[in-house]
UniProtKB/Swiss-Prot annotation:
Organism: Pseudomonas syringae pv. tomato (strain ATCC BAA-871 / DC3000)
Entries under PANTHER family matching the protein: PROTEIN PREY, MITOCHONDRIAL, ZGC:162634
Xref: SUPFAM superfamilies: Trm112p-like
Gene3D superfamilies: 2.20.25.10
Name of the protein: UPF0434 protein PSPTO_3844
InterPro entries xref list: Trm112-like (IPR005651)
Upper classification of the organism: Bacteria, Pseudomonadati, Pseudomonadota, Gammaproteobacteria, Pseudomonadales
Similarity remark: Belongs to the UPF0434 family.
Cellular component GO terms, alphabetical: cytosol
Length: 61
């Protein structure tokens, strides 16, 4: 995924910043507590497609 795109994307729920996961398969929103999938390099920014972060993931910096 293009890092320039990541700079302009925001979480559609909380409008906060997103962070690309270490394995580059998800965009993480700590504010909303959600992880949006990245499929074939394209972020799927739908709440219905996102998974809820675990407590450990929410606390991890």
């Amino acid at each position: 995924m293009d890092t320039k795109l990541l700079d302009i994307l925001a979480c559609p729920i909380c409008k906060g910043p997103l962070k690309l996961s270490a394995d580059k398969t998800e965009l993480i929103s700590k504010g909303a507590g959600l992880a949006y999938p990245v499929r074939d390099g394209i972020p799927v920014m739908l709440e219905s497609e996102a998974r809820t972060l675990t407590t450990d993931e929410r606390l991890d910096k």
